[in-house]
Curated annotation (Swiss-Prot):
GO BP: DNA replication
Protein name (record): ORC1-type DNA replication protein 8
Binding locations of ATP: V66, G67, K68, T69, A70, Y218
One matching Pfam family: AAA_22
Keyword Phosphoprotein part of the UniProt annotation: no
Length: 442
């Protein structure tokens, strides 16, 4: 029974000291762990700013949650600090997250407004793309000196818009039709897709002349150090059981080597302890958090980390895997992708694009592939599988904005799949037409 005379918000938080460090996207650490080599590459690439040369274009690759943005912010801060001490003109814009930009116009519009005062902001529409590029060049020339523009998740910008932007900006200094004469422009692009540059148009790649820095997943030992650092800041003294951080690190390492996932586990475990009124966070709280965090994590991928085409491909791969045939070939994935995209009113891309989407999902640790030799038939084909439990993926899809793409009879097919897995039953091969008729698309 609730005592109406007491305010339920009275009292203090006995578990958390401050939760911001657990929100990795909004917190910049003052210590960087296990990225010395990547930082050295970064410093080498940006040293030209300090010694008086034009800034290099730098592209940073790696899966989510492996320190790309944190390291970039840290290096940015150190570069600005050194430039100020040496009286070197330097303006840094960003990181700007590109997740929601669907055109070069929208991105350039935002960049213009980053340079402008609040009372002189450019409206979201009303100009041509050439005009907003011209406004950007004017702003860059106005500040002069070295200008570094940092774009996070640059791979989320649609290909046409990406090619337009990455072709125009780096050549602005050399283009006599722009007002840039004194400023020197460099671009830092952060991408979850290792093959990001490979799919750019040849003229764009030639213009960029970029330096590349690649970030790999963390292992369990590295994650323990990193999560321990964040936990010391986020939690009150002596509330964490000794197994909490190692368990969160081990789980995250098994999944994707992702710091972000480990931080979510710690936050969720702390919330469970607080809800119970416990004195501290235990191993049991942490295990409970790992059980619930998987669907939350996958839902976040559907809603935030994946483009719509990647999300549909991910769902199609999962559906192909749980069919009686239990084989997610590229052809089968594409057939399912086409069906769910069409049935949900979304654009259907070409079969060639499926390879690109699957590569991107593989880079993010969501799918993996195996090459199969077709023997006397000749040739090879790739078979894909998802790295998470298909049940969790489908549950996440049903809770996401892609629920309309999930076949209405998915639970029945999933139930048969789980029964087959439990009994090690091997279903007979079926034709593509028979497989296609399994699903009920609305």
């Amino acid at each position: 029974m609730v005592d109406v005379n007491e305010n339920p918000f009275d009292g203090t938080d006995s578990i958390f000291e401050r939760k911001q460090p657990l929100k990795k996207d909004t917190f910049t650490p003052d210590t960087i762990f296990h990225r010395d080599e990547e930082i050295e590459f970064y410093i080498n690439a940006l040293q030209d700013v300090i010694v008086g040369h034009d800034p290099n274009n730098v592209f940073v690759y790696g899966p989510t949650g492996v320190g790309k943005t944190a390291v970039t912010k840290w290096v940015r801060d150190k570069l600005e600090e050194k430039a100020e001490a040496e009286d070197i003109p330097l303006t840094v814009v960003g990181p700007i997250n590109c997740r929601n930009y669907r055109s070069a116009y929208a991105l350039v519009n935002t960049l213009v407004n980053e340079f402008r005062d609040p009372e002189n902001q450019l409206p979201e529409s009303g100009y041509s793309t050439d005009s907003v590029f011209e406004f950007l060049y004017e702003e860059i020339e106005a500040v002069g000196g070295n200008v570094l523009i940092i774009l996070d998740e640059i791979d989320n910008i649609p290909a046409d818009a990406r090619n337009d932007f990455l072709y125009e900006l780096p050549r602005a200094e050399a283009n006599e039709n722009t007002p840039i004469t004194d400023a020197k422009v460099g671009l830092i692009g952060i991408s979850n897709d290792l093959k990001f540059v490979d799919v750019l148009e040849p003229k764009v790649k030639s213009t960029l002349g970029e330096r590349e820095i690649k970030f790999g997943p963390y292992d369990a030992t590295e994650l323990r150090d990193i999560l321990g650092y964040y936990a010391d800041i986020a939690f009150r003294e002596d509330v964490l059981g000794e197994d909490v951080v190692p368990l969160a690190a081990a789980f995250s390492a098994q999944e994707r080597g992702d710091v972000r996932q480990g931080l979510r586990i710690l936050e969720k475990a702390g919330e469970y302890a607080r809800m119970e009124g416990a004195e501290g966070v235990t191993e049991a709280h942490t295990r409970r958090a790992t059980d619930t965090i998987e669907t939350d994590e996958l839902l976040d991928y559907f809603e935030h980390d994946l483009s719509s085409q990647q999300a549909l491909t991910y769902l199609a791969t999962t559906l192909a895997l749980i069919e009686p045939k239990h084989e997610a070939s590229t052809k089968r994935i594409y057939n399912l992708y086409s069906s769910i995209a069409e049935s949900s009113g979304r654009r259907v891309k070409s079969e060639r694009k499926i390879y690109e989407f699957l590569d991107q999902l593989s880079m993010q640790g969501l799918v993996r592939s195996a090459e199969r030799n077709l023997g006397r038939k000749g040739g090879r084909k790739y078979i894909y599988e998802v790295t998470d439990d298909p049940t969790d993926i489908i549950n996440a899809a049903l809770q996401s904005s892609y629920s309309d793409a999930v076949p209405s009879n998915v639970n029945g097919i999933l139930e048969h799949y789980l029964e087959d897995e439990a009994t090690e039953f091997e279903a007979p091969d079926t034709t593509d037409d028979e497989q296609q008729n399994l699903w009920q698309f609305t």
